[in-house]
């Protein structure tokens, strides 16, 4: 009878061991599923954070580009205005210089005419009033 009882105890022990193995197997499955879920959540959070960071960088770059564009337009406008002002100023200076050269040339011409006696009496009187002698 001892062998029957031993067989019974061995069967019970085997059943408990099998049950314990199944419990451990189920527990491992649950833990693996939980780890898988946690990994997926972490990956999704990382993906979301990456997208947010990329969008923020994109917005910042867009803002910087707009600011640069605005500053470039302002600088170009100021340069355009300064160029117009310089053009007007230099045009006036060139005109004045041209008039001075023309007047100097006219004065030289009149002096040469007067020196060689080629000037009319009216020209002499107009250009050299103190030196003209009238014959009345």
Swiss-Prot record:
Keywords annotated in UniProt: Repeat
The annotated region (Disordered) lies at 1-108, 117-136
Please provide, in alphabetical order, the Gene Ontology terms of the cellular component aspect for this entry: nucleus
The cysteines joined by S-S bonds are: none
The UniProt entry, under SUPFAM superfamilies, shows: Apolipoprotein A-I
Q: What spans are recorded as compositionally biased (Basic and acidic residues)?
A: 11-58
UniProt-listed Gene3D superfamilies: Apolipoprotein (1.20.120.20)
- Annotated LEA 11-mer repeat repeats reside at 31-41, 42-52, 53-63, 64-74, 75-85
For this protein, the record's InterPro entries field holds: LEA1/2/D7/KIN2
What more is known?
This is a SET 5a protein.
Task performed by this protein: LEA proteins are late embryonic proteins abundant in higher plant seed embryos. There are two subsets of LEA proteins (5a and 5b), the first ones are expressed when the cotyledon weight reach 80 mg and the second set are expressed above 100 mg. The function of those proteins is not known.
Q: To which protein family does this belong? A: Belongs to the LEA type 4 family.
Name recorded for this polypeptide:
Late embryogenesis abundant protein D-7
Organism of origin = Gossypium hirsutum
Q: What is the lineage of its organism?
A: Eukaryota, Viridiplantae, Streptophyta, Embryophyta, Tracheophyta
């Amino acid at each position: 009878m001892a062998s029957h009882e031993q067989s019974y105890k061995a069967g019970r022990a085997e059943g408990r061991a099998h049950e314990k193995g199944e419990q451990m197997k189920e527990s491992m499955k649950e833990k693996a599923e939980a780890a898988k879920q946690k990994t997926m959540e972490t990956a999704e959070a990382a993906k979301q954070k990456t997208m947010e960071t990329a969008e923020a960088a994109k917005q910042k770059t867009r803002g910087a580009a707009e600011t640069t564009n605005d500053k470039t337009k302002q600088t170009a406008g100021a340069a355009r205005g300064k160029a117009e002002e310089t053009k007007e100023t230099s045009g006036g200076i060139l005109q004045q210089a041209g008039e001075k050269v023309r007047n100097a040339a006219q004065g030289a011409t009149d002096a040469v005419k007067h020196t060689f006696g080629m000037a009319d009496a009216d020209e002499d009187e107009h250009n050299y009033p103190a030196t003209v002698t009238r014959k009345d």
